[in-house]
Amino acid sequence: MAALGRMVFRGKSGKSYRFKVYPLGVRFRKISGVYIIGSRLPGTNGGHRLVPLYVGHTEDFSQPFGQHRKAREFTKQGADCVCLQSDDSEESRLAKERDLIAGLRPACND
């Protein structure tokens, strides 16, 4: 499936990270990376804005997000999309995840 668009998120460090945005529920092939579960809301000028609800990383995007341990929480918060950035390095994924959680403070991250 084609991406809904692209989003840039800024971590606490000030670094910007580019993500592709997809509807929640889309199946992906087995790749690793960082993801943001979000809720798309109408923005100004006819576009959308995205409220980040959860930031995580995975070795396998082919695992359905509906099976995630926080899936009920996402749903209650209005989750309707997932933003993906592929990254093969576990060290890099963890660093990005920490930076984005600290900068975005998503509601569903503990």
List where the protein language model places each region.
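Basic, amphipathic alpha-helical patches used to engage nucleic acids or provide basic targeting signals
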Residues: 63-73
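GIY-YIG nuclease catalytic motif and its immediate N-terminal context
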Residues: 1-59, 63-64, 85-102, 106
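Short, surface-exposed basic-aromatic patches at helix termini and helix-loop junctions that form
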Residues: 73-76, 102
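A short, basic-hydrophobic beta/loop patch
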Residues: 76-86
